């Protein structure tokens, strides 16, 4: 699959997730088989660009793979400026967020709230596409509410504005993450436009990935929550798509290696004073199937020292040896 001038190595994309797809996680997903990874959502508000949080979220030239940054906002000029700044910092693809259902984002008329206003959508897409010389992509939901699904209209508008690829999450904004994703809307969009269409939502295992590709005709898949604590899902899915065979479960020793390496990277990236806090949620996700009684996770979350976290993980896995 191609996005503009860039050829992806496969059809699996790690979704942008606020507070999750930081540089350590993106790098790990890429190493585990993702063909593309997308940064956390970056605000287009220039007042926050110099904050520590924004600087950490920006991509850098030495990151592996095709460097892709997602931006969010409602002002066309600010969005264009944000795109330019991120390209200057190393972004090779700009993705526009019109899919986030969070209230704090929607209250600012950003994210999926924009789907209610196609004229504003058109203005934003036009400004951003004209502002940069790299491919611009768009992520949306199927609409604002089940009774207001307008993804076909938005998709056609996006193609007309020069968007190079479109990701669709198979829920409306009103659905949040409740219920099941539906793929009829994604299938309809794929039949309507000629730009690449990427299916997103509830793609949790290799069999589901194959089924969604076959049903929708999508060019690629974007995987988000299913990769939390399981970044090797990209390798599992790609192997199944290539061979029709399922890989055996990842050995516990490999889970330990990946988890401990991930935690060390978080400590290094954020610094010991903040890294241990960020690591807590990732450790919880990794250990969901190994620590069902939550006792270790409760103990781990009380640790306030980076080195003690690693010692606790070593001791935890020794109990399974």
From Swiss-Prot:
Coiled coil: none
Residue sites binding FMN per the record: 16-18, 70, 139, 200-202, 224-225
Disrupted-gene phenotype: A dusA dusB dusC triple mutant exhibits a complete lack of 5,6-dihydrouridine modification in cellular tRNA, whereas each single mutant exhibits a partial reduction, compared to wild type.
UniProt-listed Enzyme Commission number(s): 1.3.1.-
Record's catalysed reaction(s): a 5,6-dihydrouridine in tRNA + NAD(+) = a uridine in tRNA + NADH + H(+); a 5,6-dihydrouridine in tRNA + NADP(+) = a uridine in tRNA + NADPH + H(+)
Additional detail: DusB and DusC together account for about half of the 5,6-dihydrouridine modification observed in wild-type cellular tRNA, and DusA accounts for the other half. These three enzymes seem to act site-specifically on the tRNA D-loop and contain nonredundant catalytic functions in vivo.
Protein's job: Catalyzes the synthesis of 5,6-dihydrouridine (D), a modified base found in the D-loop of most tRNAs, via the reduction of the C5-C6 double bond in target uridines.
Record protein name field: tRNA-dihydrouridine synthase B
Lineage of producing organism: Bacteria, Pseudomonadati, Pseudomonadota, Gammaproteobacteria, Enterobacterales
């Amino acid at each position: 699959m191609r996005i503009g001038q860039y050829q992806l190595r496969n059809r699996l994309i790690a979704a942008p997730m606020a507070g999750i797809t930081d540089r350590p996680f993106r790098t790990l997903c890429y190493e585990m088989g993702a063909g593309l990874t997308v940064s956390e959502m970056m605000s287009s508000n220039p007042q926050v660009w110099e904050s520590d949080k924004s600087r950490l979220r920006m991509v850098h030239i030495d990151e592996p793979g095709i460097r892709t940054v997602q931006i969010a906002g409602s002002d066309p000029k600010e969005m264009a400026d944000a795109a330019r700044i991120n390209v200057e910092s190393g972004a090779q693809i700009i993705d526009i967020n019109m899919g986030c259902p969070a209230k704090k984002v929607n209250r600012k008329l950003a994210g999926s709230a924009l789907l209610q206003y196609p004229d504003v959508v058109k203005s934003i897409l036009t400004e951003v596409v004209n502002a940069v010389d790299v491919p611009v992509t768009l992520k949306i939901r199927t609409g604002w509410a089940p009774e207001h699904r307008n993804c076909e209209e938005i998709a056609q508008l996006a193609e007309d504005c020069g968007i190079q690829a479109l990701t669709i999450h198979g829920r409306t904004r009103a659905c949040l993450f409740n219920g099941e994703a539906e793929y009829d809307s994604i299938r309809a969009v794929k039949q309507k436009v000629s730009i690449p269409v990427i299916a997103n939502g509830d793609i949790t295992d290799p069999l589901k990935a194959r089924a969604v590709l076959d049903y929708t005709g999508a060019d690629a898949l974007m995987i988000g929550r299913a990769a939390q604590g399981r970044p090797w899902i990209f390798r599992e899915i790609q192997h199944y798509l290539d061979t029709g065979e399922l890989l055996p479960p990842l050995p516990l020793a490999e889970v330990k290696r990946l988890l401990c390496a991930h935690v060390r990277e978080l400590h290094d990236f954020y610094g010991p004073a903040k890294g241990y806090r960020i690591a807590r949620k990732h450790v919880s996700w990794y250990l969901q199937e190994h620590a069902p009684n939550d006792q270790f996770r409760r103990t781990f979350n009380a640790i306030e020292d980076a080195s003690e976290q690693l010692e606790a993980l070593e001791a935890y896995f020794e109990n399974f040896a």
